[in-house]
Swiss-Prot record:
It comes from Rickettsia felis (strain ATCC VR-1525 / URRWXCal2) (Rickettsia azadi). ATP 1 binds at G207, E208, P209, G210, V211, G212, K213, T214. Residues 3-147 form the Clp R domain. Residues 765-858 are annotated as: C-terminal. Residues 84-147 are annotated as: Repeat 2. SMART domains: AAA, ClpB_D2-small. This is Chaperone protein ClpB.
Length: 858
């Protein structure tokens, strides 16, 4: 007997039998140990053979263990050596003989198993008693191997290769485990056309991630199952290749190729009845490639070209270009089928189709408004991913969140139970006191506790009743799903009696029961319907945009936009109106959707509220004053500095880092972008801005397109400021607009100015404006001090004093901030540090003669 002629798995079984003998303190390896080792082997071959011959593996294991326990134990200090018995060697010799007679070059585990049925051993008797004899086993092995010979050391890996390294998609369709596919008829038809060709009948689905490439294959599998395909594909099966399983554990050179050849061999033998589906097709290129070895794609090429292999691939546009197109020989064997992103309305249809599957899985209900919101809001707010994937994810996560809430205690009941615990703790502490006040308190708390416990009991009963009703509805839905699968099977098998019973009897009855179970009062403790607000809440967490801005309440907010902006921006009513009108046009959907929400050029002297209006705009639209990307254009005075905005070109330092502008917008697509002091930048920078203002997008140095459609572009400039400063106090700003525009046209090109929504002039501030700004600044200081529990008060005299001293038409409101720091904040800081003002004090600011006084009231 030559041990080198045993396969790796056979050697492993022999080694394992030695371990079993040593573990049981047996001196010899007997056929019984070999049988015990075979029953525990990992490939599943022996289990399949036992099942095919009518045996029971668990029964065999118990009987073998019983016999092993009967063998005398020999305990040797330090562990004795285990020898092979003559019987075990005879079994292995017999296995070699059977393998040779069968034309095998190597002895496999099933041949050792077959050899155990010969001879008069305990192991042989156990097998015979369980109905497994040499004749039956030889027939089972022949059927299992399908005529294959053991020619390599890893021969077991090539048995039933498709089952090991593939997933039968058609079988999943048959068992109803696939989601229904809505639409995509054109892509499925084109795929069927390519598959029906004589040569090069291999379609490759190319599309962006998440557009539904794999779903098309599932749709095709469902059509094959329901016989809704041409006759040539009627009996086909779609097997998805598991590249991970194919590569995993392939330790030796040639083992991976051997596995793949076994898969391809089975497909070839099926005479066109098996269609191989390879998801992430680009993984074929380079897989299994080692020194001198061929990669997977080269093994496939001959069969692909001859039409012996029906193969469907799926990959993204980028990976197809990067891997497949580079290998022209591989690319020509596949016929591209381009899969585009569905529209929002198509996505709504898709979501309605798969709604029931998600309701069944999560045990919740999904409203139609939630489906519409998922499609429209994801399309608008999640710009870096594709429909329908991003919309399905929103529905899935909203359902998951609802499911978690349903399984936990309702908030109202939880608060009630916490209050009961709190009262019980109070009562325990008060019982130790003997005074009259404590006794009254005990009486009062005891009464409250009784009421709360009664309320809690009723609420718990109501909660449990609602919960059991939901569980009942869920069981009925599962029953309905099974009935529908049975109906499909009955219709396919032409079992009309069963089909009519299911269609007109069982299914309507279950549906009636579901309607009764779901007729729950909406005012109950448990909310089981996923609504539009739940979807908006999920998007809010992803993007950081407040929920209110996504739902219908936004309409009311937009109508009072001017009023809200005037609360923080004083004296610039024309500017506020211009900005508000542009934002309303965009939000109402009557502006070009491929442009930013608004683009403005703010012109005016320093300190009049240009930047403040930008912050107020961010606060109003995104509920965050810091939702601003501020780019100081004085940093981009040189031509080469422009590349910092979109990223350094290939070959330059910083290429991998991305651009200041593009990366910030990619990470946070909803913000106000402020280009400050824009006239100081190099003129070439406006060429980049043309694309943003016109198309609402910009391509960075790495070829990634960044979406600016949900941003507001604000450019500020001091051009023509001297004209606006020298204007009379109450003169209309637009009288001098033409003069200011002469300065603007001298710096900016007409094509740039034409793309802006509004050019807004900010006039200089008058004394009344300054008075209002003083009030806002002091209110802001009041809030800061309130955090330290110090109350700040001020009267009209203080406001007038600061307004008079802080008014400078040339510098706007900026001197006012410095004045408040000098006159108030500096003195307050000294008093706080000296301990004159402490927590709980009230401080009043008032004018005395020609200066401000800070008084501590208490």
């Amino acid at each position: 007997m030559n041990i080198d002629k045993f396969t790796a798995h056979a050697k492993s079984v022999i080694a394992s039998s030695q371990s079993i003998a040593a573990k049981n303190d047996h001196q010899q390896i007997l056929p019984l140990h070999l049988l015990s080792s075979l029953l525990s082997e990992e490939t599943g071959i022996i289990q399949t053979l036992i099942n095919n011959t009518g045996g029971n593996i668990n029964l065999l294991k118990d009987q073998v263990q019983l016999e092993l326990n009967k063998i005398p134990k020999v305990q040797v200090e330090g562990g004795g050596q285990v020898y092979s018995s003559a019987e075990a060697l005879k079994v292995l010799e017999k296995a070699s003989s059977i393998a040779k007679d069968s034309g095998d070059s190597f002895v496999t585990i099933e041949r050792i198993f077959e050899a155990l049925t010969y001879g008069n051993t305990i192991a042989g008797k156990i097998l015979t008693n369980n109905g497994i004899n040499s004749k039956k086993l030889a027939a089972a092995i022949l059927q299992f191997r399908k005529g294959k010979k053991a020619d390599t050391e890893s021969a077991e890996n090539s048995y039933d290769a498709l089952k090991k390294y593939g997933r039968d998609v058609t079988e999943l369709a048959e068992s109803g485990k696939l989601d229904p596919i809505i639409g995509r008829d054109e892509e499925i038809r084109r795929t069927v056309q390519v598959l029906s060709r004589r040569m090069k009948n291999n379609p490759v689905l190319i599309g962006e991630p998440g557009v539904g490439k794999t779903a098309i294959i599932e749709g095709l599998a469902q059509r094959i199952f329901s016989k809704d395909v041409p006759e040539s594909l009627m009996n086909c099966r779609i097997i998805e290749l598991d590249m991970g399983a194919l590569i995993a554990g392939a330790k030796y050179r040639g083992e991976f190729e051997e596995r793949l050849k076994a898969v391809l061999g089975e497909i070839k033998e099926s005479s066109g009845e098996i269609i191989l589906f390879i998801d992430e097709l680009h993984l074929l290129v380079g897989t299994g490639k080692t020194d001198g070895a061929m990669d997977a794609s080269n093994l496939l090429k001959p069969m692909l070209a001859r039409g012996e292999l029906h193969c469907i691939g799926a990959t993204t546009l980028d990976e197809y270009r990067k891997y497949i197109e580079k290998d022209a020989a591989l690319a020509r064997r596949f016929q591209p089928v381009y899969v585009s992103e569905p529209t929002a309305s198509d996505t709504i249809s898709i979501l309605r189709g798969i709604k029931e599957k998600y309701e069944l899985h999560h045990a919740v209900r999904i409203s139609d408004s939630a489906i519409v919101a998922a499609a429209t809001l994801s399309n608008r707010y999640i710009t870096d991913r594709y429909l329908p994937d991003k919309a399905i994810d929103l529905i899935d996560e909203a359902c998951s969140r609802m499911k978690i809430e349903l399984s936990s205690k309702p908030e109202e009941l939880d608060e009630l139970d916490r209050r009961i615990i709190q009262i019980k703790i109070e009562l325990a502490a008060l019982k130790k006191e003997n005074d009259e006040h404590s006794k009254k308190k005990i009486t009062h708390l005891t009464e409250e506790l009784e009421k709360l416990e009664s309320k809690s009991y009723d609420m718990k009963a109501k909660w449990q009743a609602e919960k059991s009703k939901l569980q009942q509805a869920q069981k009925l839905k599962e029953e309905l799903e099974r009935a529908r699968i049975d109906l499909e099977r009955a219709e396919r098998d032409a079992n009309l009696a069963k089909a009519s019973e299911l269609k007109y009897g069982i299914i309507p009855e279950i549906m009636k029961k579901i309607q009764e179970a779901e007729s729950m009062d909406n005012k109950g403790l448990l909310k089981e319907i996923v609504s539009e607000s739940d979807i908006a809440s999920i998007i809010s967490r992803i993007t950081g945009i407040p929920i209110d801005t996504m739902l219908s309440s936004e309409r009311e907010r937009l109508l009072v936009m001017e009023q809200k902006l005037r609360e923080s921006v004083i004296g610039q009513d024309e500017a506020i109106k211009g900005v508000s009108d542009a934002v309303r046009r965009s939000r109402a959907g009557i502006q070009d959707i491929n442009r930013p929400l608004g683009s403005f050029l703010f012109l005016g002297p320093t300190g009049v509220g240009k930047t403040e209006l930008t912050k107020a705009l961010a606060s109003f639209l995104f509920d965050d004053r810091n939702a601003i990307l501020r780019i100081d254009m004085s940093e981009y005075m040189e031509k080469h500095a422009i590349s910092r905005l979109i990223g350094a070109p290939p070959g330059y330092i910083g290429y991998d880092q991305g651009g200041v502008l593009t990366e910030a917008v990619r990470r946070r697509p909803y913000q106000v972008i402020l280009f400050d002091e824009v006239e100081k930048a190099h003129p070439d920078i406006f060429n980049i801005m043309l694309q943003i203002l016109d198309e609402g997008r910009l391509t960075d140095s790495q070829g990634i397109t960044v979406d600016f459609k949900n941003t507001i572009i604000v450019l500020t400039s001091n051009l023509g400021a001297e004209i606006l400063v020298n204007q009379k106090e109450d003169e209309d700003t637009y009288k001098v607009k033409d003069e200011v525009m002469e300065y603007v046209k001298a710096v900016f090109k007409p094509e740039f100015l034409n793309r802006l929504d509004e050019i807004i002039l900010f006039h200089r501030l008058n004394r009344n404006n300054i008075h209002d700004i003083v009030k806002i600044q002091l209110e802001s200081l009041k809030k800061i001090l309130l955090a330290q529990n110090i109350l700040l008060e001020f009267d009209e005299s203080a406001l007038n004093y600061l307004a008079e001293k802080g008014y400078d038409p040339s510098f706007g409101a900026r001197p006012l901030k410095r004045l408040i720091q000098r006159e108030i904040q500096n003195n307050l800081a000294k008093m706080i540090l000296a301990g004159e003002i402490s927590s709980g004090n009230t401080v009043k600011i008032a004018r005395e003669k020609e200066e401000l006084r800070i008084k501590i009231i208490d």
